[in-house]
Amino acid sequence: MLQIILVLAMFVILVIPMGRYMYHIATDQKTFADRVFDPVDRLIYKICGIKGGDMSWKEYALSLVTANAVMILVGYLILRIQGFLFLNPNGIGGMEESLSFNTIISFMTNTNLQHYAGESGLSYAAQMCVIIFMMFTSAASGYAACMAFCRGLSGRKLGNFFADMVRIITRVLLPLAFIVGLLLISQGTPQTLAGNITVETIEGTYQDIAMGPVAALESIKHLGTNGGGFFGANSSTPFENPTVISNMIEMLSMMLLPGACVVTFGLMLHDRKKEKKTVRKPLMGRQGAVIFGAMAILFVIRSEEHTSELQS
């Protein structure tokens, strides 16, 4: 019980400042990180030819679908020809047609249905350039759509999909994934480009131990509420989730951004109806508190039901 209370307390402590930070990003207000990320964003806009300006809902939706379609095509091709690409120390061949299609669609839609064992089915290049890349972009696409939806409900213009996607990746997902990745490495999660290691067991037989850029994938997998994993058994393997602390880190990572979106939504609605006398911004706004409370009640009810199922 103490462990559960500790994780939930840490979640509440982290989710409010994270939600306020995302609120400032969603409403294009100044943040403490602007000095670092503004030049990065401008460089990306210049390279990609992204122009500012608000979009209609049709333009926003079309941009989302088109961008994701292009990434699906590129990712599919990489999976098919991974055997000829770099960063393939274990000599893994190209993925079969239908499995490539299933994999790329699954990870682009944030469904993350995985019908392959990552340690034997994907090269490091495919893991990084397809799976990890899609975990970033699918999550960013979802959060961009969420931001646009919240803006619409609060009476604002929808914004620009490409600008939203870039800002979410550079200002939210990448920094958090870097921090979480370092924390997982400190707990024993591998992060290497070396090939598999062959060791002799205590029984006198030999076994291949799969390695790779595991921490990089695990960090964004949980932050972006993705599924799957670097290994076929996902986070039940010691390398993906080696300690109790890594388990807490991964649970908090999964909960952080979805909870922060509720805080962001509440603050955006509060802005639309606040009185001029209001000086101090609330923690999450009245609507945000209602939604957050409803989610907490459902969480407790479902947890009780799940506990009863396990005991029976």
PLM features: what roles do these ranges have?
Residues 1-312:
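Membrane-proximal intracellular helices of multi-pass ion channels
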